[in-house]
A protein has these predicted regions:
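Donor nucleotide-activated moiety binding/catalytic core segment of transferases
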Residues: 288-294, 367-370
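Single conserved hydrophobic/aromatic residue that forms the stacking wall/gate
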Residues: 1-16
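Beta-rich carbohydrate-recognition and catalytic domains
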Residues: 46-99, 103-163, 171-290, 299-364, ...
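Bacterial Sec-dependent N-terminal signal peptides
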Residues: 15-52
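Short glycine-rich, acidic/polar surface loops and turns
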Residues: 359-361, 369-372
Length: 401
């Protein structure tokens, strides 16, 4: 019995030893599983932040398309307007609605969108007028049935008829004066022009922005697309002054600069050869290889002046093969707040590209997200853009996320 008991004790000792060894192995397995789960979670987390991680801290990268909202404005064949130039009723927004300006008026977001009638076929062949739409939430809009800005029998008719008034951008002063830049198109020459308003419906046209600069030297030069420098003051986006002057970036092929003391008469800055000073140009092999066209009003931030712009991609070897040839994508650049002509940094990749079907079909099927309107509303930034020269859509950036 004693010998037998000894044998049993030895077996128990061996069994205990095996149990301990098994326990250690199990713990190691559990630890390995835990490490793998942690690694997977980390990878997933990095994946979720990949979009913003590849952009510098000065950029506003995370603009999101609100689900089930876009496009927010589409053509309407049921609205008619008596055109003072044709002296006839026209379906003024029957063909295309696109390229919107945006601002805030009386607590509501107001979008001024370019609308084309059905008078002809082809880009730039119809007459453009500006429609008015307002929204409480920046997403759902109520439209007026007639345009608020159009070619008329006024001082600007020779410069605006028959092509119309195109591609507006609008910003507001602290005392509530709305300043709009738009393109006058008489189908001979495009000119950047200025208009002002207190209510966004009744406008005073001031004519070409550069009419008086350098004794009228540039009044007949091709010009368009202006981004006035703005800033946030007490939650309101207003036109800013730098060194006692107003500043704007402008230009289609290149980004140029101009200044003003009254917001109506603008003086373009010139280089050593007396030509328009180029502060940003297209880059070979990039999404903006063909042109760099100014977008919505620029924003003065704690990092500098943030300019959102439109880049067009060249076809072939000179373009960026990651994006469709001739497509328009949205880029961002940072300029020095003390010297607005000094480019500090620039994104190598677009922060917003054509994705939805209506952004890749219409007048411009190569794909277009053409940004022109930017407003701060309900603690968020709303970016309004044209889709393939045919629709209007919105994207939202929440700076608190």
């Amino acid at each position: 019995y004693e010998i037998g008991s000894g044998l049993v004790g030895s077996e128990m000792c061996i069994r205990d030893s095996l149990f301990i060894t098994s326990n250690v192995k199990m713990k190691r397995k559990l630890q390995n599983i835990a490490y793998l789960l942690m690694a997977a979670a980390l990878i997933t987390s990095c994946g979720e932040k990949k979009q913003t991680a590849e952009f510098p801290d000065w950029a506003w990268a995370d603009f999101q398309r609100p689900e089930g909202i876009n496009p927010i404005i589409s053509p309407d064949t049921t609205t008619f307007f008596y055109c003072p130039m044709r002296q006839d009723s026209v379906a003024w927004e029957a063909s295309d609605t696109f390229n919107p300006a945006a601002t805030v008026y009386d607590g509501k977001v107001v979008v001024l969108y370019r609308a084309e009638d059905n008078s002809a076929t082809g880009i730039g062949s119809r007459t453009s007028r500006l429609g008015y739409a307002s929204s409480d939430d920046g997403l759902h809009f109520k439209r007026m049935s007639v345009p608020v800005f159009y070619p008329a029998d006024d001082s600007q008719k020779e410069l605006e008829n028959p092509g119309g008034c195109e591609d507006p951008r609008v910003a507001v002063t602290e005392d509530g004066l709305y300043v709009m830049h738009y393109t006058q198109w008489n189908r001979k020459q495009a000119r950047l022009a200025v208009a002002t308003s207190r209510d966004l419906q009744t406008w005073e046209k001031h004519g070409p922005a550069f009419a008086k600069a350098y004794n009228g030297r540039f009044i007949d030069e091709f010009s368009k697309s202006a981004s006035i420098v703005t800033q946030l003051i007490d939650g309101k986006q207003v036109i800013a002054k730098i060194d006692g002057k107003y500043w704007m970036y402008w230009g289609e092929k290149f980004v140029n600069v101009a200044t003003s003391t009254d917001l109506v008469n603008w003086e373009p800055m010139l280089d050593e050869n007396g030509e328009f000073l180029k502060v940003m140009v297209p880059r070979a092999g990039k999404f903006d290889s063909d042109l760099t066209e100014c977008g919505p009003p620029a924003i003065l931030t704690d990092k500098g002046i943030l300019l959102l712009y439109n880049g067009k991609n060249k076809s072939g070897a000179e373009g960026d093969t990651l994006y469709t040839a001739n497509s328009y994508c949205a880029g961002q650049a940072l300029f020095d707040a003390k010297d607005p002509t000094k480019l500090i940094d620039r994104l190598d990749k677009p922060f917003y590209i054509p994705e939805s079907d209506f952004e890749k079909s219409g007048q411009y099927p190569a794909g277009t997200v053409f940004i022109e309107g930017l407003v701060f509303h309900n603690q968020k930034w709303f970016l309004y853009y044209g889709c393939a020269d045919s629709r209007v859509a919105v994207a939202v950036y929440d700076p608190l996320k």
